[in-house]
Amino acid sequence: MYLIKEKNIHPKEYITITDYCNMGNDYRPKVEFNVTYSNKGFHAHFNVYESKPYASYKNHFDPVCCDSCVEWFVYFDSEKSNRYFNFEVNANGAMDVCFRLNRDVFEPVSVEDVNSFNIKVDIKDNCWTVDYTIPFEFIKKFIKDYDFKKDVVLKSNVYKCGEDTEFEHY
């Protein structure tokens, strides 16, 4: 279990992605994920250790999973809602996100909402990073009686993928 801590109060602790599907290649870039909270919302941070990430899509809601992409799937309140959010972002900062019951049943999110996440990407020689904030007010649009509690346990998954990259990986 991963304890979500208050932003800028504790040293960052990362979850590292270690499991990849066998795609017939050995491409398994190291990915670190961290999530913290503040009075504004949840702050997600990824370190992706790959050089020259493939990033063809530039607009929110494009199929960014085809690019070099990181994904966070999260139930913000599994007791009040059986739906989860999927946040998928590529190295251009383009995000695909919606509120899902499952793969086929989902509620769309507006471009204005995605713009409020303040997505920041930084690409360096052998690493790229992604930072964004999910405001509590955004969550309340979909989970009406959502109330953040400091010691909440969030069910979530973190992924790295690239369907159309030089070395397909999941």
Model-derived regions, located:
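Structural preference for beta-rich elements and adjacent junctions enriched in aromatics
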Residues: 1-170
